[in-house]
């Protein structure tokens, strides 16, 4: 299987969007010439429109951000170029000890705590989001490759947790018991502060697979981060 994962992310402006499309044009050009037996694309849950109910693989792909537009466009480019089995994995927010992104959430909170800096939340951290362990994403990629699966699959646990709760969990695990503070919100909450998922398709596709709980994943990330330092 060929796994397509490279992207300049998160895509924040038109220039980044153009570069990401150009990147995929190079990939699809190569795939057109040499058709692999199986292609897996790592996309994003950002392709979905906001919803008050749990999102699933059949939910409307109507992105409200350039990041979502970028991934949806790249999905369509691959569908046009790949003649064999194509699997599209759409992870929600990913966390892990070695994750290179310092985005708002578990990764940033853990690094701030390690540096002895207070954790500043957006608003009071009341948004509730799903977070998936990077090892679970890797595990799903391996299963998809082994089974030569095709179609769309979300990578999301089905459990939402507020950012304040996540910050409290991180601090409880850390050596530095830093302060957690709210801050004035500078705009509307992303996704209206709530983005749940229905993980039923994962269980149907891979019955033996189970997602890591947030508590276990944060504990493992903390241990791995400490060992690396």
Q: Where are the language model's segments positioned?
A:
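C-terminal substrate-binding subdomain of Rossmann-fold SDR/epimerase-dehydratase oxidoreductases
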Residues: 117, 122-125, 129-229
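NAD(P)-dependent short-chain dehydrogenase/reductase
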Residues: 76-128, 134
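Active-site helix of classical SDR
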Residues: 66, 70-73
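Active-site beta-alpha turn of Rossmann-fold NAD(P)-dependent dehydrogenases/reductases
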Residues: 7, 40-44, 64, 90-92, ...
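Hydrophobic positions on the long internal alpha-helix
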Residues: 23, 27-31, 77-78, 140, ...
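NAD(P)H-binding glycine-rich loop region in Rossmannoid oxidoreductase-like domains
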Residues: 1-22
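Active-site proximal helix/loop that lines the substrate pocket
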Residues: 8-11, 44-47, 93-99, 126, ...
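Conserved Rossmann-fold NAD(P)-dependent oxidoreductase catalytic core, especially the SDR/UDP-sugar
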Residues: 25-66
